[in-house]
Amino acid sequence: MHKIERLLQTLAPKGVEFRKLGDIGEYKYIRGVTYKKNQEINNLECGIKVLRANNITLSNHLNFEDIKVINKNVKIRKEQYLKKNDILICAGSGSSEHIGKVAFINTDFDYVFGGFMGVIRIREVNSRFVYHIFTSNIFKQYLEKSLNTTTINNLNANILQNFLIPIPPLEIQQEIVKILDQFSILTTDLLAGIPAEIKARKKQYEYYREKLLAFKPLTPHKEVKKC
């Protein structure tokens, strides 16, 4: 924490810039593959594997149980294959608690994502930093407010691109990712352990996540009028 504070004092003494996700350079939001029931097959080796909403846990990790496989003749765009540093997000569901679930993709692999899913692809900002923002209360509160304006549980491109996020200097982003990933790994390692200990570690991660992502907004410089 002390290192973050020192970096903020050195690199962002006047505060941190906030920008809409859609205004960040090289930002893309891609919706998933749509297919028919009769295009599903049972052979994992002969088709294309599809990740759906149930493949992201409520704790924002990938779950490879119950993978759907579709025929190779289904029309798929190249950009719909998952790539390293993608943020996979649940964009549509009958249950509002599943909307906005995210998982981070650590490597390129031969999976696509279904029509009720989306992928956020971003380069100008550390994508792992953005992932942690999407797991935070910052995004949850924004989502609750945005979805209250519609009766449909659908996270569309407009909602996402208007999400305001903090953009601290890259060195600060990297340091925050390093700290939060350590807590996240500890929580994951304990999943087979004592429930009380798992709960305590999860609360610790959530506490530091909210604390580390609470930035003072950059105050625009105002010219002093001369008499």
Positions of predicted regions on the chain:
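Charged, alpha-helix-forming regions
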Residues: 1-227
